[in-house]
From Swiss-Prot:
<dbReference type="GO" id="GO:0000287">
    <property type="term" value="F:magnesium ion binding"/>
</dbReference>
<dbReference type="Pfam" id="PF02775">
    <property type="entry name" value="TPP_enzyme_C"/>
</dbReference>
<comment type="pathway">
    <text>Amino-acid biosynthesis; L-isoleucine biosynthesis; L-isoleucine from 2-oxobutanoate: step 1/4.</text>
</comment>
<dbReference type="InterPro" id="IPR012001">
    <property type="entry name" value="Thiamin_PyroP_enz_TPP-bd_dom"/>
</dbReference>
<dbReference type="GO" id="GO:0009099">
    <property type="term" value="P:L-valine biosynthetic process"/>
</dbReference>
<dbReference type="GO" id="GO:0030976">
    <property type="term" value="F:thiamine pyrophosphate binding"/>
</dbReference>
<dbReference type="InterPro" id="IPR029035">
    <property type="entry name" value="DHS-like_NAD/FAD-binding_dom"/>
</dbReference>
<dbReference type="Pfam" id="PF00205">
    <property type="entry name" value="TPP_enzyme_M"/>
</dbReference>
<feature type="binding site">
    <location>
        <position position="71"/>
    </location>
    <ligand>
        <name>thiamine diphosphate</name>
    </ligand>
</feature>
<keyword id="KW-0285">Flavoprotein</keyword>
<dbReference type="InterPro" id="IPR012846">
    <property type="entry name" value="Acetolactate_synth_lsu"/>
</dbReference>
<feature type="binding site">
    <location>
        <begin position="324"/>
        <end position="343"/>
    </location>
    <ligand>
        <name>FAD</name>
    </ligand>
</feature>
<dbReference type="GO" id="GO:0009097">
    <property type="term" value="P:isoleucine biosynthetic process"/>
</dbReference>
<feature type="binding site">
    <location>
        <position position="173"/>
    </location>
    <ligand>
        <name>FAD</name>
    </ligand>
</feature>
<feature type="binding site">
    <location>
        <position position="490"/>
    </location>
    <ligand>
        <name>Mg(2+)</name>
    </ligand>
</feature>
<feature type="binding site">
    <location>
        <position position="463"/>
    </location>
    <ligand>
        <name>Mg(2+)</name>
    </ligand>
</feature>
<dbReference type="Pfam" id="PF02776">
    <property type="entry name" value="TPP_enzyme_N"/>
</dbReference>
Amino acid sequence: MTLTSASTVVGGLDANAPQTISGAAALMDALRRHGVDTIFGYPGGAILPIYDALHIAESEGWVKHILVRHEQAGTHAADAYARATGKVGVCFGTSGPGATNLVTGIATAQMDSVPMVVITGQVPRPAIGTDAFQETDIFGITLPIVKHSWVVRDPADLGSIVAQAFLIAASGRPGPVLIDIPKDVGQEQFNYVPVEPGSVIPGGFHQPEPPLDAAVAAALDLIEQAQRPLLYVGGGAISACAHDSLRMLAERYQLPVTTTLMGKGAFDENDALSVGMLGMHGTAYANFAVTECDLLIAVGARFDDRVTGKLDTFAPRARVVHFEIDPAEIGKNRKADVAVLGDLGLSLARMVEISLQRTAEPRTAAWLERINTWKDRYPLTIPPAEGAIYPQEVLLAVRDLAPDAIVTTDVGQHQMWAAQHLRNGPRGWISSAGLGTMGFGMPAAMGAQVAMPDRQVVCIAGDASILMNIQELGTLAAYGLPVKVVIVNNHWQGMVRQWQESFYDERYSASDMLNGMPDFIALARSFGVDGVKITDRELLHRDLAAALQSPTPTMIDVHVRRGENCYPMVPPGKSNAQMVGLPSHPELAMGTTRTCSSCGAITAHEHRFCPQCGASL
């Protein structure tokens, strides 16, 4: 069988026999062998041979290409596809500006440990280094933000490179990889020998070892001894599908559980053991708990600054158990007393298995009672229903009306309110946490909807961040993706304004978005997307419910109170106990309070640290 061009059928090749085909056809066959069923991308000159082969692959029915309106959106969609499914996301882009447009999305995936294979076109091999039209060194540009990258110099290497790329992207700590393919490599005919997934091991590559029983047992010993333990769960628990083992461990030892922004969904936030999210905009009770715990059990979390606040005051009385797959994270920000290195799913399953061989005697009753006191005293507050709609009301309405939806978010105040008030299952919360990429939400919703066509997908956005990738309304319309985009519209860059109010003496430099803001509903309709504007509290539930039930893509523009701030908040440089925006309790009798000897502040008797200055009480 001799294939003479990329436009010849690429599917159905013999599993092992060499075939004479083009590099582009070989690439598509390699992707098929790795189970790729969806590709997000945007064509251009250097990648046209690959798109020619993709056209044939689509006609065979094994893959679907989603044409985005901007390459950055393609990376975010592939990212969310991976987060929603646990599979590797795939996106295409051409050389030059097409490739550089991918960079923000690659960095977003890298910061959040998302497996993704990014394939770029490149100028022909003889033109590399000549400043040819649309030539950029995307290999060099992306080196700091990928796990590995390749420039394909010989089409015969394509099968092996694709196999390595998928292995590296998905193994260990997941992350993005990049394959840069010169145009003439895609065109060249050669004897293609198919390479099966997992059959090529890159040099120096090592699969994570199973967890050591000694480390697991040592961690279990500390849990059994602790009186004030706290499970601190990050995104690694979701990547490892460890939520069932996590739940069993928490229930068996009655461990309270807090999650990071990336860890939302790893543990049921409706469970009495949940204390919600911790950190800068976490719940007061999560931040008090981490400050007073005597054992911190970190699961797939990296002790980042938005979680820890002032690092040397983070969990100051606690011993630390760290479950982690990436050895570079052990001891990076916080020394671990016991480190359990390995796949989190295997590690937690093994811990549950060993625990069942012991008698579980939880010692946390008094600790849970204290946490419940904090929950009662410092709940997430909802302002009184008067005047303009409050942002929190919008999120509570979404929670009531779409409790099982996959939620994606943009970045800003709306993201934090969503994290505080929504309750999501595993892989049901998709947000840019590490890089904080504005414009992530709508493309991510596209990717999640393509991945999960039978699930409801809701994007929570701000009026500033939605404009970063507003053109993707065209993608929603073109493919009929029934995503619901809820804009929490306060006509500000809300988080920037809040910081300017709090820390820059109310100098609102370049954060007011009132002038020049589009009519979002008219804009959506111009793309062929339905839209509804909500400004009246009395109509919020009715109109939101109708929009969420629509079978078509819909934009919902909810105008909210302009000056509302997101609280609680840990100010920069402060400890987690030094939150601002907590509800006051003037009714407290002196007999139930403590006075801080450092700053004189009066606080509840059950506190061990002063919420004003962070001093030990």
